[in-house]
UniProtKB/Swiss-Prot annotation:
Gene from which the chain derives: kex1
Spans traversing the lipid bilayer: 524-544
GO molecular function: serine-type carboxypeptidase activity
Basic and acidic residues: compositionally biased ranges: 590-604
Glycan attachment points: N122, N441, N449, N501
Disulfide-bond pairs as recorded: none
Protein's UniProt name: Pheromone-processing carboxypeptidase kex1
Signal peptide: 1-41
Organism: Aspergillus oryzae (strain ATCC 42149 / RIB 40)
Amino acid sequence: MFSSISRGFAKSETGDTFSFSFKSSWLLSLLVLWGPPLTTAKSAADYYVRSLPGAPDGPLLKMHAGHIEVDPQNNGNLFFWHYQNRHIANRQRTVIWLNGGPGCSSMDGALMEVGPYRLKDNLTLEYNEGSWDEFANLLFVDQPVGTGFSYVNTDSYLHELDEMSAHFIIFLDKFFELFPEYEGDDIYLAGESYAGQHIPYIAKAILDRNKNAVSPWNLRGLLIGNGWISPADQYPSYLTFAYEEGLIKEDSRTAKSLEVLQSVCQSKLETGGKDRIHIGDCETVLQELLSKTLDSDNKCYNMYDIRLRDTVPSCGMNWPQDLKDVKPYLRRADVVKALNINPEKKSGWEECSGAVSSSFLPQKSVPAVQLLPSLLESGISVLLFSGDKDLICNHVGTEQLINNMKWGGGVGFETSPGVWAPRHDWTFEGEPAGIYQHARNLTYVLLYNSSHMAPYDLPRQTRDMLDRFMKVDIASIGGSPADSRIDGEKLPQTSVGGHPNSTAAEEQEKERMKQAEWKAYAKSGEAVLVVVIIGVSVWGFFIWRSRQRHRRYQGLYHEDVSGASVLERFHNKRSGQDVEAGDFDESELDDLHSPDMAREHYTVGEDSDEDDVNRQHQRTTINPS
């Protein structure tokens, strides 16, 4: 941006060097002083997604994407994709979604589960009617470094959960510097699978940060689906689940051979293994279970959805079927450009990184289940949900985790000594949906007919689950509420689908954005531009007045028309551009899109960042997710 401005002052229109007066030298000094921030510091506009190839017809959803540096020494950058909420309920909320692995991209969640779009094919996006961005801002992050679109030097992959959470706090600090309007939101950390380790560690790191923070973050809840949270409870569950689901017959030869392996695993757990996150002898149980249950076509069970079969040795790694479209879509050059991927990211997008996974084998970190009691006791609400057809992180293990955990003066779902909270039948739109159970800040939901990636199978039901957990109040919004019932009784209204905002909600949002406006200006460097423009204006006015005053004194002041041309060229250079766009020239904007991209949809004027300001004064084996 500075180079664009300073070029306007270098020459007159005829090419002659412009001779600065004392006043113009003062202005140039001001520009030089402020130059480095203008050229190096990114603003929110640098992350703005102006178009998205294959998007449905109509205005594009408001979104930002790109990299935030978390480890300068090792070139560590985390990629994020953020969607602004489509409707405003009673409170402003942000849901941060993480997939597992470790080393599997949260683009799984964005394009196959809870994001606003799903792929119809590798060229075309369609709306996800159960998207989680309806009443919450939605933030997907590829982490740890090296995952998905994120990157780091190849000798600097992470090993421990504390390292991961430290990076994440740095990421959030910088994210909120760029987007201060979201810093006061209620924050919910959500994800699945190995994110069952990541999420509690990040939550603890946030609470630790808040102790000394000038602006504490409003962490309200955690949502973990089919989570790898307690290996000591999950490893022994494989055989139990296989028996219950009829994958293996008890007392069969196969069962007996697997029980021998299970006893070795149990011995490891009882001799220090309960404080470990990965135990090789226990991993063997699942591997052998899959290899000993091949069908007549020599296909194994899909470990993420036992209703399906897959080729050996994948056994689920080729699932879900949408994955065949996600990878080529995210490797398209126009998509990479639209999502503001840094040139330093040399390799194309991969769902799961083997290098990250093989490096992230914590030796010092304790299982995240040991962090849950203190989080619950601190007032953080926790929702554990399980798709009932998942094998690898099955619901039997999750239920055993809850039964064994002590917090808040009780064990498991005790409501009083020896008395447990009842299980409630949940129906959604007239069909059995699952089971709800709750006690002392912990909620458990078993989702019928769903896999390791429950939102993939049941987008509307899981959205309803989210809204209830966040206590979304849609009274002021309207629309047709979903028919969701517990034990036959209709629950407080939630809605799934598009609905207009209420006037009151819009006014509340405008006021919130107005309060954040100057903070956003100051952090993005726009205030600097305002100062420069004011300086130019004052200087120009002073010169004009002086010339008018002394015009009658012939020869005393020689009128140099180049001064006027500077201001004119400056105005012409900047007009028609986003005020936050730096030196992003309009011709460069045209270069973003190739001529054959006629089906892409661009945001209309009122959806740009600049107009918001004007308008609002506004996948180890745990992978693939």
